[in-house]
Amino acid sequence: MKIKGNNVLITGGASGIGKIMGRMALEKGAKALIIWDVNQEALEATAAEFASRGRVYIYKVDITNSQLVAQTYQQIKDECGSVDILINCAGIVRGNKTFDQQTEQDIRLTFEVNTIAPMIITKEILPDMLRRNSGHICNIASAGGMLSTPKMSVYAASKWAAIGWSDSVRIELQEMKSNVHVTTIAPYFINTGMFNGVKSPLLPIQQPEPTARKIIRAIERNRTFRGIPFGFHFIRFWQAILPIRVFDFVFGTVFGIYHAMDNFTGRTK
């Protein structure tokens, strides 16, 4: 779907890759950029930075609060008009702990932000897209949603669920012959601060600018799925043909993915 002339809503859009995609959307002529984030200071700084690039609307939203999501979406419709492109980008990770060390609070929060919130937001916005028979939903999942990864089991589970939901909605819309499209993105670790401390001996940590560019391009081309880097498109193929122990050796030992989180620290603020 074209970015130019359309309203783009990005959750988690005041920092990291969400912020970069917002800038790119404005550069491509988005009618308005709508940013949801929980960090008021970052929202205001982003709005000031982007002010000369186009129309920017900022909203402080706790996306785990379904009532606030509904209220804010109504406010958007009153102030900005329709949401043509929704990018569910907000996410959290609680890593460097084995599952037995995870707290119930961390488990619930991870699923509320990474899995349930995109569903609630999409459920709020999708009916209007269906009525217009136009729109695009892009869900930022993770390569961790295709690979079992020690010390981030809860995060991986939340992203496995996100991928299953996102692609199922895509098929539902396809069978409805709707002109609303869904793109699922599964990137490897991205160097935005969210995964500080992660080590990847053979597979390169992805850089934010080219990653954001690939996501925007996937939206514009109505791609159904985009692994980043491209080789992650073949993960399921290798899982299907390799014995589990061989797969574990190749991806866990040779590529070092199973130990990527050993020194994880994440964002410090």
Report residues per predicted region.
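Substrate-binding pocket helix/loop in short-chain dehydrogenase/reductase
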Residues: 97-99, 103-108
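Conserved glycine-rich Rossmann-like NAD(P)H-binding loop of the short-chain dehydrogenase/reductase
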Residues: 30-46
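Active-site helix of classical SDR
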Residues: 122, 158
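Residue(s) in the substrate-gating loop at a strand-loop-helix junction
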Residues: 142
